Amino acid sequence: MYLVVGLGNIGKEYKQTRHNIGFDVVDIIAEKYNIEINRQKFKGSYGEGRIGNEKIILLKPSTYMNLSGESVIEAANFYKIDKENIIVIYDDMSIDIGKLRVRGKGSAGGHNGIKNIIQHLNSDIFPRVRVGIGQPDENVVNYVLGKFSKDQREIIEKVLAMSAKACISIVEDGVTEAMNKYNGVKIEV
């Protein structure tokens, strides 16, 4: 069983912002596998389904980004999911737009949502899909809560689809295979 968590902020004002990349990827997976994310529990919205023979829980925390760990730990404990089977999808400023990076473990890298998840799980050993949003020319908060330009959006739509495939690959083939397949790929217009 896998817990697939997309990080983001709830509310219409945050829809399609850079910081809501995780929510967007989870929505793509939900659509592909006909999973309704309409149940409220674990301080978030979730739905259950299958990727092949593997049961998955899709979770969108409603705690706001910086407290995402509260939601993740509640769902993980309820379903008794191993940390190695918790996949977290989120935006990453250290990666260029058009790229993603799959990792099996690692530090928060300055991302407060991941930092909070690491604190609550008491471990940094969980897979993640880091989606590049590029470096800001402006205030970081304004940047991550801002929307992509039209040109960037074209690239991001393709990266979101690729990120969903990377998550599915982790479930079906394992982290190493997903890393080999998706790390280093760059989407351009």
Curated annotation (Swiss-Prot):
Record-annotated site: Stabilizes the basic form of H active site to accept a proton: D91
UniProt GO molecular function: peptidyl-tRNA hydrolase activity; tRNA binding
Gene3D superfamilies: Peptidyl-tRNA hydrolase (3.40.50.1470)
Record CDD domains: PTH (cd00462)
Gene Ontology cellular component annotations, sorted alphabetically: cytoplasm
Active site residues according to the UniProt entry: H19 (proton acceptor)
Disulfides per UniProt: none
Enzyme Commission number(s) from the entry: 3.1.1.29
Keyword terms: Cytoplasm, Hydrolase, RNA-binding, tRNA-binding
Localization per Swiss-Prot or TrEMBL: Cytoplasm
Role, per record: Hydrolyzes ribosome-free peptidyl-tRNAs (with 1 or more amino acids incorporated), which drop off the ribosome during protein synthesis, or as a result of ribosome stalling. Catalyzes the release of premature peptidyl moieties from peptidyl-tRNA molecules trapped in stalled 50S ribosomal subunits, and thus maintains levels of free tRNAs and 50S ribosomes.
PANTHER family cross-referenced by the UniProt entry: PEPTIDYL-TRNA HYDROLASE
Stored HAMAP family: Pept_tRNA_hydro_bact (MF_00083)
NCBIfam families: pth
Family classification: Belongs to the PTH family.
Protein name, per record: Peptidyl-tRNA hydrolase
Organism this protein belongs to: Clostridium botulinum (strain 657 / Type Ba4)
